[in-house]
């Protein structure tokens, strides 16, 4: 028997998400909860059919086609309508639905099944020709765009031209005759672009639409969204074929989107929007600015009462805030979909805490339901209140996604991306955004749209990304072609500064200063619960007391990486390090290093004080020496004068430091082997600082000295001997009983492979996954960006291995080294200090392999704390 690729809504349930996708599983579950009379019925083509489509060379095979045709017949029996029948036609929508919600990422087709014959009969039988022709022109436009990839703009231009000729401003003001003319113009446009007639056979239309949904799983914007949200390519998408409910039959019809709680603030109140005489995509696409959901009560009282009752039932059933789409057809309510709603980080925390307080979920469930990556947005700036009070808004629209943003105006996603890459802060200003704009939206500080509401594409995507967004500013007079707009009498051109307040919807001229965000009470509650359930410690990467203090405020339990070279770049210090580099003898080098020692000691004391007894891992000098030498002629001359050498001699020294591959050159422990006096100086500074701060604070400090880039145990043994002899001497001279540890970074594959040998010398390992990734893959982090996009396009890599740990290769080395290290030294401390320490999927991996801690940048500490708790909760299920 062949595999089952198609399921009626009545055959599925919420547990079948992997097979039916999120939308399909929820439609099946919703059918069970609220009944088939409220949920327009249909069937779901599974994610396995999508995978099969790609395996068969992007073709729907005969078996899957036969099952689809069989289920069309079943759908006809359920609805009493017939596909392609002009007397009683079955019209359907075709939508994608992956396992994870991907709003706006994939394409929807409405009114499929229409052709000229069916439309004429519908127009006559319904007595509503305007509705019939509106459905048809929409279908031609969507099918042409989504299935045949004829750009939307050609059709929009024809609509705008027609409105201009008729002297109207809204699509709804066009008559049945106008829409009939448009439909024929659309078909002519289709033929001109494609070279064949628009398909009239509904089964041909349906297969084309299903293929388009499968194909859209691999479109560029879907690939970008998947990479950003950890959604594997292998999952595929399901396709939902659902009988149509019509919100565009007249003024007793409408369509809307609603949330059971406010997705921007988390407040417990129904929030949403609807449009009368419209179809589903109109609300989300932002073509007309809709009415608040409360006004639906006056228009459709019975449907509104039923809707609020269903909202309550759905939220109680799913135990989470729901995002629902609905249609009212001749005063009767139809529910088209429900899903857990996208929300801002602040709303996510409030909703989670409120659901715990309402007895709906447990603390563990609250911790598990928050996306750790979204916490980042809470820690980002808001407008300075004083400056904000003094500023007068030049416009106001809908506060679609909170936060403060100021930057230069740009008008296209391409410009936003290009300017952003140069380090410019930009505000993307659009009539409305579409999924094609996703990369520009990512690059922008804020987004401002002329059309669209709180549930438009711009609003939903911006909230998901944590980007400030103000939508539906109809006061703007936009001239996209010439890249300018007029607001409150002022013309703004590309490059002019504006500021947006995503919490109020206010728009300001110029730049308003921002201040650091303050964190609310819900953040503290969620973090306290996270700390209760996690076993993995979280440290920070910090080189300055300010970073260390910030990280402690955000819950860091120590410093996992202090890069000492970052302390060498201040004017007085760089002079001393350059003197050391230019020295000819050990004595000269020691003299130069003696100038650096008290400065380093002071730095370490400040870090120890900030950390109040928590562990501090200090990495000894790592980068190659050429990074410290001057490149400008005037600086070279200055160095020659201070060193009593000629410019030529200095240039010769600089030239001698040149390496063909500095990443694998004279750096890390190799510097300490060549110049042990550097390691000795840094050891003295570390130990003296620890002794002083231990006395001052009355706390026990155990310095952790980390030797970088070890690949051979004998290297470590050599440098460790220098460190221990120096440290023991300083401790003895001070009459102290200070204890210290010497460990190493595991960042060379050979170190991972011989970790049992290295653990005999090292009291702790810290995995430097940035270098370990470079050396395992054999490509440079600084150059990989030039070719990684091609690798993503060709499905060689799904993610940037420098952003998410490569669990199959690099991860195997980490796991092996951890096991080997523990076999030789059971109490060895294991950490990770690469950028991966703040990535949730990498944190989960670190939990699984039994590391002691992860270390990440200060602002990512809360992300790591929450991700560690989620990993632990998942592990104990």
Residue ranges and their predicted role:
Residues 396-436, 487-525:
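Extended, non-globular alpha-helical segments
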Residues 95, 519, 529-877:
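Conserved alpha/beta-domain cores
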Residues 38-39, 469, 830:
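Hydrophobic beta-strand scaffold residues
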Residues 331-334, 431-442, 446, 454-460, ...:
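Glycine-rich phosphate/ribose-binding loops and adjacent secondary-structure elements
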Residues 210, 379-411, 525-531, 535-542, ...:
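Flexible inter-domain linker/hinge segments
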Residues 240, 410, 427-429, 448, ...:
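Structural motif
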Residues 41, 450-452, 471-474, 562, ...:
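Short beta->alpha connector loops at strand-helix junctions that form conserved
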Residues 1-391, 418, 424-427, 434-439, ...:
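Nucleotide/phosphate-binding sheet-loop regions of phosphoryl- and nucleotidyl-transfer enzymes
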